[in-house]
Curated annotation (Swiss-Prot):
A biological process from GO: protein folding
Protein name: Protein GrpE
Region named Disordered: 1-49, 207-229
Compartments reported by the entry: Cytoplasm
Family the UniProt entry places it in: Belongs to the GrpE family.
Species for this entry: Mycobacterium leprae (strain TN)
NCBIfam families noted in UniProt: PRK14142.1, PRK14164.1
Amino acid sequence: MTEGNPHEQVTVTDKRRIDPDTGEVRSIPLGDTPGGSEPAGMTDRSANSTDTMVDKVAELTSDLQRVQADFANYRKRALRDQQTASDRAKATVISQLLGVLDDFDRAREHGDLDSGPLKSVADKLMSALTGLGLVAFGVEGEDFDPVLHEAVQHEGDGGEGSKPVIGDVLRHGYKLGDQVLRHALVGVVDTIAGDGAETVAIVAPVDSTAKTEQGELGDNVTPHKEDGD
């Protein structure tokens, strides 16, 4: 065994990460790292990997936004369809009760709804239907509207300058929102422009029996004129 040179200088390298004197973490030169210097091209690959991840995140974000938009549109469409179905069902039920309202109108004409339990029932039913959005229309003197009114009698020649108005209401019409549930059956008269006012061709009143028959059958009624007209 050959002994070493007793005068050879021994070099001791302190590889401790923390300096025992200062307590601070020592910086390690790049060449002293366990892996040595970074392999060539690693920086470029890291940059390319980062770009790829950014593109992937952008793609997934776009997909998520598209799915969210599709769901929002679906939810709006579902709510709209649900409301439409609800309105249709409501209109169907209320339409079945219009005949009852006609009976109440005839009872009111005969004075049967002036007081008593029947008046209370009629008022409560009409209040409930009004709360659901039911609106009655068809009033004497208002302009005739073929969208809302069905004319079963007509007085006047409809000449130039005349305007058709409702002269008699044989059966009220009803609307639910913008939907016409039933047209009003009316008698129409033509107004003629006069001096500062309008002259109206008058139709003789129709008794309640005739109104009932016309409201149920929808037959035309021959207008009656008073003597001297």
